[in-house]
Amino acid sequence: EQNLFFLQVVNFLKQLYVLIKPGVISLVIFTALCAMLLAPSDKSLFIKGMTLTLIAMGASGSAILNMWFDRIIDSKMDRTKFRPIPSGNISANTALGTGLIFSFFSVVGLFFFGNIKASILLAFTILYYSVFYTMYLKHKTAQNIVIGGLAGALPPVIAWISISSEQIFYPLILCLIIFLWTPPHSWALAIFRNQDYSDADIPMYPVKHGIKKTLFMMNIYTFLMVASVNSLYCLLYTSDAADDT
């Protein structure tokens, strides 16, 4: 019985790892860490580590809730039909409960280890992605990724305001870079899985406007993203120059 319980726990953790979308979470951690390294702060490494962990936990919770809301659509798409919920490897109720627990404790934890502003922004980000984007935007407009991309762009801002109240324009530029990067990144996958999205009746940009126009828009967003990266570099350079004088 102990061996069976152990195997069940291991299997649950494996399925949980898939549910939290580790590729997405690693990006959240990386961008939040970049903001923390730039932010002027005298917070301890422990506080910074807890803040980063709680942001990752909140992102994990919203990813799980996203998969719970999308479980029916996922079962219709070749790319997603083997995910834990549609494949039956984890129950929908278990996934929902886990997502809610992760989301709740991340927001509450950030209130104690960060501040109320960061906690509220994290709660907004979770709701924006898991409810507004997943339940509404994704199914209503070809601009779903553009508008919904705000959720994925906010972690640097959350991380920054958790430990610092100075020079807020830096994390806003980081947010802008990720926001502009999201459409070309997501549309590349949408082009590759164009038929999959069409079969699931999801109005991705390539499905609604064709591949040629999508490629044109990808180039526009890429150009704007590069410009925003250069603006961050210029700000950092001028800031360093001012400090040296």
List each model region and its residues.
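Intramembrane alpha-helical segments
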Residues: A92-S165
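Cytosolic, membrane-interface loops and tails of multi-pass inner-membrane proteins
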Residues: F69-S87, W187-K212
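Helix-coil boundary and interhelical linker segments in multi-pass alpha-helical membrane proteins
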Residues: L37-T51, V107-A118, P156-L176, N230-L236
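Interhelical loop and helix-boundary elements at the membrane-water interface
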Residues: F12-V24, P84-A95, F132-A151, M204-F216
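Multi-pass membrane catalytic core of lipid/isoprenoid biosynthesis enzymes
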Residues: R79-I120, H209-Y233
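Single conserved hydrophobic/aromatic residue that forms the stacking wall/gate
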Residues: Y237-T245
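Functional transmembrane core segments of multi-pass inner-membrane proteins
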Residues: D42-K43, G149-A190, N194-Q195, I211-K212
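Membrane-embedded alpha-helical segments that form the functional core of polytopic membrane enzymes
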Residues: F30-C34, L38-F69, I120-V131, P171-W181
